[in-house]
Each structure stands twice: as structure tokens, then as C-alpha cells.
């Protein structure tokens, strides 16, 4: 799922849970249905990703789409916890969006057999959010 800064979903892709995150970056970026404004010096467009996306291929792909990648390196958070006793992990906006989506029981547990039906339900829920 791809969401904007306030947590509104703007792109959704359905894929298997056992698939590496880096494999769904391109389909997710291509799933944005509206044309976004071009990034400017004053308003650069960043893309915050977690450690599962910390690969050069992902960084190159994100750059091709015109985003600035903000990816926390593997092990960086663990080092910050060791250095600062009161350090708390940063909560990503997309995690909050996932919790909003979990209010809809129909998508919390996937009962649909085809990915097309499940994707349609996801689009419906994203429109409601």
C-alpha cells in the first residue's frame, strides 16, 4: 500500500504475503490512479520505506519515478536504541492506515478466492478512508 502524508491510501497492490517487499515496489508505484504534480525544489516528493526496501535496485527505481527515497538502513534503529535510552521507534503513516483498514472485517481476513475481488474490496475501503 502507498499512502500520502496524512495516511490517505493512493495506491494498492495485492500480492502474496511470502513475497519479498522489494518485488512489489514497481507495481505499487504504478498503481497510483491520479497524475501527481512534478516535484519542485520547494516541494520535493519523498517516499518513506522501511528496512525491507534497503536495496540499490529499489533506490534506483524510486529515483526513476521521481521520488526521493527515505529508507532507514538495516541495524540503524537497533543502534539508536542502544545509544539513547528513551528512544522510541518511529511509527510509519502507512501502519496507521493499515489499522484504519482493519476496521473493515471483510478485508481483515481474506475470504475472497480471486485477487480481483479482494482488490475491488480494497479499493472500496480506500475510497471510504
Where are these regions (language model features)?
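Helix-centered, glycine/charged polyanion-binding patches within enzymatic domains
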Residues: 36-115
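Active-site beta-loop-alpha junctions of metal-dependent nucleic acid enzymes
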Residues: 13-38
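Short, contiguous, pocket-lining structural segments
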Residues: 2, 17, 54
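Charged alpha-helix within mobile-element recombinases
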Residues: 117-129
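Acidic, contiguous segments within the catalytic cores of piggyBac-derived transposases
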Residues: 14, 89, 125
Amino acid at each position: 500500500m502507498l499512502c500520502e502524508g496524512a495516511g490517505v491510501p493512493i495506491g494498492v497492490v495485492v500480492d502474496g504475503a511470502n513475497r519479498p517487499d522489494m518485488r512489489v515496489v514497481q507495481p505499487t508505484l504504478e498503481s497510483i490512479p491520479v497524475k501527481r504534480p512534478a516535484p519542485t525544489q520547494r516541494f520535493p516528493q519523498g517516499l518513506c520505506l522501511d528496512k525491507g526496501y534497503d536495496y540499490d535496485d529499489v533506490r534506483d527505481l524510486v529515483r526513476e519515478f521521481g521520488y526521493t527515497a527515505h529508507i532507514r538502513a538495516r541495524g540503524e534503529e537497533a543502534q539508536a536504541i542502544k545509544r539513547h535510552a528513551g528512544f522510541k521507534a518511529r511509527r510509519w503513516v502507512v501502519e496507521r492506515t493499515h489499522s484504519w483498514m482493519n476496521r473493515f472485517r471483510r478485508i481483515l481476513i481474506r475470504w475472497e478466492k480471486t485477487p480481483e475481488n479482494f482488490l475491488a474490496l480494497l479499493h472500496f475501503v480506500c475510497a471510504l478512508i
